[in-house]
């Protein structure tokens, strides 16, 4: 009898939790529609389909926000009801009132925030603690009428809570049924609740592969609509997540107390002293180089191709029999191609590679793409503004969505003329991260065909990434042939085969693109091919550090010879810009770079945890060779200082 009463209490409260969830979810979507209507002036050239996409994906991600409140009431009301069956409805209503007040407060605050920053809430909300908090508080009172606004929000929330109270008290079906007391029904209720929780957790999906979250929700071509897809709670969560990343900026090798010594070290390694531009009161002038004179003729097209998870190991001779990278290997072996095996990505994740290519800074876990300094002015080491001085336009092409890691905003802020991505087009196949790579490369070929101006194209692929959803059979992946060549202990590992197939697909797309461009525009192109990072897929359980972490660096084009890069060079992503300048810039051209050109003897590369030089590789554990230690400290300390504090050294 007691258990039956407890079940009835549990079931009663659980039904109200579900009713509360529906109310809050609908309310979140109502707020989103109001935002779309009242803030439409921020939108660009949009159509009905864009608006429907915004509402659809917004509704999905808001399931998570509504689920947060339901989780609280389930734990602190419904489960507690097994022990104390008093005032539970009031407790649920009280928790809901607090949650609704926060929603309403954020909804109003968003209008002011968006007007100021042209974005929904982000990490800058949490950076406010570094400001003069007292002055900030008074500004909010005087300029934004904080006190009066809060009173109005409280009154409005009270009205919403009153409606919620009536809604929760309303019984859809007043009659009880006998089957509700059966064991099968009780088990069914519990199972349904667990399945529903999973469905909400992944935003109207049952797996990560098809989930939606703040990192992949930029589904439209319009920045404003992408921001509105995030409800205000999700935007706050985005800001919190980014801030946590930034807070991890205390990283091995950063010694800001030694900033002068590190600047001087790089000034002596660059041409700053020879050009008499050294200045220890600031950073930029100490990073100047003077080009020795173009090694090859200036090209009409320069392509910097960054393959997602495009590791080096499948391109090595010891793995050639797998034929996973035959297209890129064929490029490497051409007479007019050169490469170095001693090459490291800038970090462990894609944003670090993007940051290195765009702004030329070493990774220190502070994400320059989210730093205020990156949007105040271009860095002296940024690639796009410098290559423009030689007569090139610049375009960034991404197979994903523009809102990912603020990639569009960052690229444009750092000097790129144009940005193109999956959001700009209707594409036939893809996943939560973007379109299949072949589509964006096809669009790029169309752009090249109609563009008569000398242009640098940076291309970032996306398909070789979870959830690994490319139709490999349709693409022609010889799965069974690869399986037969794998070590016996992994031949039945279907997940591994799928990942290897996506590497094969990336290689195929890159190879086909390079071949098509070369055939159509012979002798007019320079290609640089690399990967954003490795350390995702290997066929060994314990691969060597070299096979686990290194990425390729291949330079291909008319005029390139094998001996342009010697066997005694090593580097990483921050050396790419300088290398391109030395290849095509006229003698005497001045450029700014943290990393030295591979053609001028760069000899150190590292990511977040591993270093290499021309003869060895190892973990960053304090036992690095002295030249690695000094170079790493200088690169990282200056990158941290330049991103956080700016150019000047007090």
Identify the residue ranges that each predicted region occupies.
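Residues that form generic nucleotide/phosphate-binding pockets
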Residues: 58, 62, 139, 162, ...
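Transmembrane and membrane-interface helices of multi-pass
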Residues: 2-250
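Generic alpha-helical secondary structure signal
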Residues: 8, 12, 49-50, 131-135, ...
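Intrinsic-disorder-associated interaction segments
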Residues: 3, 7, 11, 252-259, ...
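Solvent-exposed soluble domains appended to multi-pass membrane proteins
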Residues: 270-650
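Extended hydrophobic/aromatic-rich secondary-structure runs
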Residues: 139-142, 149-207, 267, 273, ...
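Short alpha-helical "patches" and their helix-cap loops
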Residues: 91, 248-258, 370-375, 594-596
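The feature marks either
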Residues: 221-225, 229-290, 298, 334, ...
């Amino acid at each position: 009898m007691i258990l039956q009463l407890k079940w009835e209490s549990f079931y009663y409260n659980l039904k109200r939790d579900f009713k509360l969830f529906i109310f809050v979810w609908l309310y979140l979507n109502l707020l989103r529609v109001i935002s779309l209507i009242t803030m439409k002036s921020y939108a660009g050239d949009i159509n009905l389909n864009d608006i429907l996409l915004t509402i659809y994906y917004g509704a999905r991600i808001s399931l998570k926000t509504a689920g947060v409140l339901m989780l609280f009431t389930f734990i602190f009301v419904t489960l507690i009801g097994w022990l104390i069956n008093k005032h539970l409805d009031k407790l649920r209503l009280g928790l809901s009132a607090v949650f609704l007040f926060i929603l309403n407060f954020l909804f109003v605050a968003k209008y002011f925030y968006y007007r100021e920053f042209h974005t929904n809430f982000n990490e800058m909300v949490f950076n406010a603690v570094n400001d003069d908090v007292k002055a900030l508080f008074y500004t909010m009172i005087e300029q934004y009428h904080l006190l009066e606004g809060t009173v109005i929000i409280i009154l409005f929330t009270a009205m919403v809570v009153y409606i919620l109270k009536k809604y929760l008290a309303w019984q859809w079906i007043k009659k009880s049924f006998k089957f509700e007391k059966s064991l099968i029904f009780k088990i069914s209720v519990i199972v349904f609740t667990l399945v529903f929780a999973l469905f909400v957790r992944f935003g109207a999906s049952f797996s990560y592969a098809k989930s939606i979250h703040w990192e992949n929700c930029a589904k439209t071509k319009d920045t404003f609509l992408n921001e509105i897809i995030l409800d205000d709670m999700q935007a706050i969560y985005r800001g919190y997540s980014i801030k946590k990343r930034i807070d991890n900026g205390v990283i091995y090798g950063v010694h800001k107390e030694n900033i002068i010594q590190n600047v001087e070290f790089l000034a002596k390694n660059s041409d700053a002293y020879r050009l008499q531009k050294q200045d220890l009161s600031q950073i930029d002038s100490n990073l100047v180089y003077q080009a020795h004179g173009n090694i090859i003729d200036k090209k009409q097209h320069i392509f910097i191709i960054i393959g997602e998870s495009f590791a080096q190991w499948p391109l090595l001779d010891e793995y050639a029999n797998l034929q996973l990278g035959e297209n890129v290997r064929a490029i490497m072996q051409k007479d007019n191609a050169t490469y170095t095996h001693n090459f490291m990505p800038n970090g462990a994740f894609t944003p670090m590679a993007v940051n290195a290519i765009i702004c030329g800074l070493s990774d220190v876990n502070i994400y320059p793409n989210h730093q205020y300094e990156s949007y105040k002015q271009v860095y002296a080491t940024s690639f796009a503004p410098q290559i423009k001085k030689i007569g090139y336009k610049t375009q960034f092409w991404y197979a994903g969505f523009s809102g990912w890691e603020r990639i569009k905003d960052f690229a444009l802020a750092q000097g790129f003329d144009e940005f193109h991505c999956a959001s700009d087009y209707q594409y036939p196949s893809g996943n939560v991260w973007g379109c299949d790579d072949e589509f964006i490369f096809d669009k790029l070929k169309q752009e090249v065909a109609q563009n008569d101006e000398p242009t640098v194209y940076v291309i970032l692929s996306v398909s070789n990434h979870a959830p690994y959803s490319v139709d490999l059979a349709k693409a022609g992946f010889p799965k069974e042939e690869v399986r037969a060549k794998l070590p016996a202990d992994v031949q039945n590992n279907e997940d591994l085969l799928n990942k290897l197939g996506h590497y094969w697909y990336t290689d195929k797309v890159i190879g086909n693109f390079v071949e098509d461009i070369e055939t159509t525009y012979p002798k007019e192109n320079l290609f640089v091919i690399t990967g954003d990072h490795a350390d995702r897929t290997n066929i060994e359980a314990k691969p060597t550090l070299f096979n686990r972490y290194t990425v390729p660096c291949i330079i291909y084009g008319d005029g390139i010879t094998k001996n342009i890069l010697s066997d005694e060079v090593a580097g990483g992503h921050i050396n790419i810009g300088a290398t391109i300048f030395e290849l095509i810039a006229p003698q005497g051209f001045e450029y700014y770079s943290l990393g030295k050109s591979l053609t001028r003897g760069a000899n150190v590369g590292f990511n977040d945890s591993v270093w290499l030089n021309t003869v060895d590789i190892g973990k960053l554990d304090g036992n690095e060779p002295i030249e690695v230690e000094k170079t790493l400290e200088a690169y990282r300390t200056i990158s941290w200082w330049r991103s956080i504090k700016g150019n000047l050294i007090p």
